[in-house]
Amino acid sequence: MNCQHKMELFACRASKDFAAKVVAELNKLQPEGEGEIHLGDSEVTVFSDGEFQPSFTESVRGATVFVLQSTFPPAENLMELLLTIDAAKRASAYKVIAVMPYFGWARQDRKDKPRVSIGAKLVANLLCAAGVDRIMTCDLHADQIQGFFDIPVDHIYASKVFIPYLKSLNLENMAIAAPDMGGAKRA
């Protein structure tokens, strides 16, 4: 890989299995002589009151750190991502990129009735406050969520892979549904 900063890939607990598959696929694409990509070592200390503290067991100083974590429920998955981003920044990572296959609270993208929060905007604020430099996510509930960030957001659409795959199955009477009007355009 020709870049100034080494790349390190880490996974939070909810995404360890998925991250191992990502690393295997990345290594298939890696040009000869570039060296193998590995999943970085990290650990999570759980305290007696249930609080947890992620930490890196190897140096990330000067590295571009990718942290892979889906933020599906429970909320601890989001909190672990936030703490891991913070730990990377405090360990002098050059940049921290959050890879979020599932962006939790994305369905709360607007104020659709009085006295409700806009959860997606709050999550964006929390990620930025933790120190993330870039977000990579897949199939956001609504495109406008990208505008909640003041950092780059790479919004990846699974349809580029999913639609050709579904067509290859030659299924009859196939129906695709969406949970609400926000997802109807994608369906």
Residue ranges and their predicted role:
Residues M1-A187:
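PRPP-associated nucleotide enzymes
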